[in-house]
Each structure stands twice: as structure tokens, then as C-alpha cells.
From Swiss-Prot:
Its EC number is 3.4.24.-. Belongs to the peptidase M16 family. One of its GO terms (biological process) is proteolysis. This is Uncharacterized zinc protease y4wA.
């Protein structure tokens, strides 16, 4: 599964790591400056944005600053229960779901439209069409020509963004409350009335092809992650990159775009989330008058995708590249997700990732960076928010004269300790506190709240599930964390990836 990149030029989007603390992300820690950062490397990880011109390095810097602020603030947060938001959840007559999250602390409002379609729903041979449609949604309708929507948002001093993931595609704007009707009118118009001609399709296809060259072909880390995903998932469409395979993207045409748009872009396949200085009654009225006038789209079948066979092999992916200056290692496993888990399993995996590699207090950091001093970075993350089975990943980079094999062995040893001996009650409670405080901090943000609800509902959860999430985290037991590690983190079902400078690789380096 994947995480969205963001569309630059208008501030952090809900798809960007600095604005998505509600998503559990890859973390890395550097002893040289004492700061912590977050990033989606799958992204994480395999999602993409509207225009794709943001430097990955710049994003990393933004992430590091953001998480330092997040952790400082969150650790000082009140231990009291989360305040109850007066969240309203209702359906329009045409099947569009609406969530309203009032927050009257500032005169702004965030509108998000989540379509329950992502790259995992693409027809075979049409990879990248979901992301392509995201681009095309900015190209105009008969009523509003290309660029008018964005110009209007800029005129009123608002922000906008869009992102594509494996399970959803989302568009959002942040404006003043009096501009909400205008935003709804524009979004409703392009939901069903997009104009797609060859004059629009061909140039924009060139744009996404160039985006792939820039984002993936020129980035060894992205190339490795793409190969890792394709190896980790043997049958499920999560193995396909969100941006698409180049040879299939080159063949995308107007007919492909129209079929995808007509099938999935409809009110009964969308979720409207409005957070900010609004009340539910007013939002219901505006939604009825704008989105409510649209006809239903086709009634779609359940989102049943090809599932993974039982995995029973250790697989290795190694990429050597002269552009790599610092080697790195990561290892991934297919796991359950919040969309597929038995009761408590996904929560246990979230706590496992926190204890194993979730920060400077984690086992990986303390053992590899502080005690042994063999790693410059290291951590773990669980990509739990997906419709189908997801993944758990550990990672690290060697420090000084240390070898990448030493880092891998040390991380494997920490996993074995948890599998064999479990975790202590003290570290369990500390991990829960850190995790719940990060949720509290996320809920203090309009876009954070809108993102929490949108992603959850788009992947099969309910508004009640969102409200109960912190309580479910609090209920995790030490034995459940150990059981999750034992069940999912077997070395015989893993994919290990190595990113290496060309001169350091030998034919026998990664044979074990």
C-alpha cells in the first residue's frame, strides 16, 4: 500500500508527512544533531501528487523539523481523555457520505473529497491511471476552464492540494468559511463534468511521464522501494507503484481516462469531510445544494482484489548505484492492516513499531545508535491504514566503519528478543503514552482531523472506529505485542533490501 506525496506550492497537504501525524510513518534518527524526522518511503511510499516537482530532500528536511515539534509538544500534552468532538456523519440522497468536524478556534475551514479508488483498483495493464486522473481533475469543465479553480483559491488566500494512494484519491482546500460554498460548487462540478479531450490528455500524459523520470528513475532509493514492493507482494496490486509502470503509462489514452472517471468519480463513491469553523446544519444545507444535485454513478461491486498466497521464502533485493553515498538496509513483511485485522492485532503492531523503532527511546535506536554505535539511523514502521493486508518494515544505515551486515544482524537480534522474551510492562505503557499523545496532537489540527476521518472511512472503518482508536491502543497487552511479532516477523517470510554504492557491492555480499 502507499502513502501520498503532496502537490507543492500551496503548503503541506494531508498527503504530506508534516501534515499527517495520524498516519504511522517511517522514522529516522540522527545522533549528529539529535533531531527526529518522519517520512513515507513507500510511499509512504508509493503514492504521488498532482505536479510532482517537490524535492525529496527538501521534504525530508521539512519532516525532520515537523516531527521534532510534534514529539516535543505531544510529550507535554495533557494525559486527560481526548475531548469529544461534535462530529456529524450523514448521507446525502445520492449516496455521498458526509463528515462534519466543528472547530471554532479559528475562522478557517478545510474541505476534503475522498474518492474510494486508488491505484490498487486500476484495470490490469493500466497502471498509473488513478494518478493520471488526479492530474486531469485540474484541467477544467465546460463551466470552469482549466486553472480557474486554482486561481480562485489563490485569489481568496486559500490553499489546495491533491494526492493519490493505493486505496483512495483525495482533493482538499483550506479557505475562510464564507468561501466554502464556492469550493463545494467547484468540486461538485468537476466530479461529474470534467472535459477530457486529446488536447488535454496528451500533454498531461507527458507531464506524468516526466514526473516518473524525476521522482523514480533519478532516485535510487525510490527505485529500490519500487522493487521491494514488487517483491514483497507476489499477487496483490499493492505491488504496483502508484505512479505506474513507465511502459503502461506511455499507452494511457482518452478512452482509459474517461472509463476510469465515469466509473469511480461519482457522489456514491465519495466522502466529503469538512473540518473547521462550521456547523453540521449549514454544511448539510450546502452539500445538498451542490453535491446533492448530482446523479448517482454506477453501483460498484465490493472492492475485492487478488490476495496474497502464503509466503514462505526469504527474498533479497539489492540495488547498487554510483549515486548512492551512504548504504542502507530495510526489511519488510506482509502483515494485517486495520482493514483486515483480527481484534487488537493492528493496534498491537502499531505498539510493536513504537517499541522496536519508533523513536530515540526505541530498542533499535538505543541498541544500535547509542550502545553499539554501529548505526547512524534506524527504526521501524507499520503501514496499518489500508483496505487489504499491509506491511511492517525495519531499516537502518551503518555508521563509520560498521558494515551493513552488522546493522541487519543487530536489528534481527532485537526482533528475536521480543519474539522470545516479550516486552516489559513499563515500556508498553510508555509506548502507549507516546502513541496516544501523538493522536491527541494530530487531533488538534483541522487537516489532521479531516485526514483521520477521510482515510479511515475510505478504507472501511467508521466514524465510531476513529473515536475509539485511542481506547483500543490503550487496551493493547504485552502478550499481544509479542504474539504479533511472532506471527508476522518471521525471517523466512521477509524481503530484505540493500541500497549500496557501486564500488562496495560484491557478488557474495547479500547471499545470506
Amino acid at each position: 500500500m502507499s502513502e501520498p506525496f503532496f502537490r507543492p506550492g500551496s503548503g503541506p497537504a494531508p498527503g504530506h508527512p508534516t501534515a499527517e501525524p495520524w498516519r504511522r510513518r517511517k522514522r529516522w534518527y540522527s545522533p549528529s544533531d539529535g533531531r527526529a524526522g518522519t517520512a513515507r518511503s513507500h510511499l509512504p511510499q508509493r503514492s504521488t501528487s498532482h505536479d510532482g516537482v517537490c524535492s525529496r530532500i527538501c521534504a525530508f528536511v521539512l519532516c525532520m523539523v515537523a516531527l521534532q515539534f510534534l514529539m516535543t509538544s505531544a510529550m507535554a500534552a495533557d494525559e486527560s481523555p481526548l475531548r469529544e468532538a461534535e462530529v456529524a456523519n450523514f448521507m446525502l440522497g445520492n449516496g455521498m457520505e458526509v463528515v462534519v468536524i466543528p472547530d471554532h478556534r479559528a475562522p478557517i475551514v478545510t474541505q476534503m473529497i475522498w474518492y474510494k479508488v486508488g491505484n490498487a483498483d486500476e484495470p490490469p495493464g493500466k497502471s498509473g491511471i488513478a494518478h493520471f486522473l488526479e492530474h486531469l481533475m485540474f484541467k477544467g469543465t465546460k463551466k470552469h476552464p482549466s486553472g480557474e479553480f486554482s486561481a480562485k483559491i489563490a485569489e481568496i488566500g486559500g490553499e489546495e492540494n491533491a494526492f493519490t494512494g493505493s486505496d483512495y484519491t483525495a482533493y482538499h482546500q483550506t479557505v475562510t468559511p464564507e468561501s466554502l460554498r464556492t469550493m463545494m460548487e467547484f468540486e461538485a462540478d468537476r466530479m461529474r463534468h470534467l472535459v477530457l479531450t486529446d488536447a488535454v490528455i496528451v500533454p498531461e500524459r507527458d507531464v506524468i511521464l516526466e514526473e516518473r523520470r524525476w521522482r523514480v528513475e533519478n532516485d535510487p532509493e525510490q527505485l529500490l522501494e519500487e522493487e521491494m514492493q514488487a517483491t514483497l507482494y507476489q499477487n496483490h496490486p499493492y505491488r504496483i507503484p502508484t505512479i505506474g509502470w513507465m511502459h503502461e503509462m506511455e499507452q494511457l489514452n482518452r478512452e482509459d481516462a474517461l472509463k476510469f472517471y465515469d466509473r469511480y468519480y461519482a457522489p456514491n463513491n465519495a466522502i466529503l469531510v469538512v473540518a473547521g469553523d462550521v456547523d453540521a446544519g449549514r454544511v448539510r444545507q450546502l452539500a445538498d445544494e451542490t453535491f446533492g444535485t448530482l446523479p448517482r454513478g454506477p453501483d460498484l461491486p465490493a472492492r475485492v482484489r487478488p490476495q496474497e498466497p502464503e509466503q514462505n521464502t526469504k527474498r533479497i533485493v539489492a540495488l547498487t548505484d554510483p549515486r548512492v553515498t551512504v548504504p542502507s538496509f530495510q526489511k519488510s513483511w506482509v502483515t494485517t492492516s486495520y482493514g483486515t485485522a483480527e481484534q487488537g492485532e493492528a493496534e498491537a503492531l502499531d505498539i510493536l513499531s513504537e517499541i522496536l523503532g519508533g523513536g530515540t527511546r526505541s530498542r533499535i535506536y538505543q541498541e544500535l545508535v547509542v550502545k553499539q554505535a554501529i548505526a547512524s539511523s534506524g527504526g521501524a514502521y507499520f503501514n496499518g491504514r489500508s483496505l487489504d493486508p499491509s506491511s511492517f518494515t525495519v531499516f537502518g544505515s551503518p555508521r563509520g566503519e560498521a558494515k551493513i551486515e552488522e546493522v541487519e544482524d543487530a536489528i534481527d537480534a532485537e526482533i528475536r528478543k521480543i519474539i522470545e522474551f516479550g516486552i516489559t510492562d513499563v515500556e508498553l505503557e510508555k509506548a502507549k503514552n507516546r502513541f496516544v499523545r501523538s493522536i491527541i496532537f494530530a487531533r488538534d489540527s483541522q487537516s489532521g482531523m479531516a485526514g483521520i476521518y477521510g482515510a479511515a472511512l475510505a478504507t472501511g472503518d467508521t466514524a465510531h472506529d476513529v473515536e475509539a482508536w485511542p481506547l483500543r491502543i490503550r487496551a493493547v497487552k504485552a502478550a499481544e505485542v509479542q504474539a504479533a511479532a511472532r506471527k508476522y516477523l518471521s525471517p523466512d517470510r521477509s524481503v530484505a533490501g540493500y541500497l549500496l554504492p557501486r564500488e562496495s557491492a560484491t557478488s557474495g555480499d547479500k547471499s545470506r
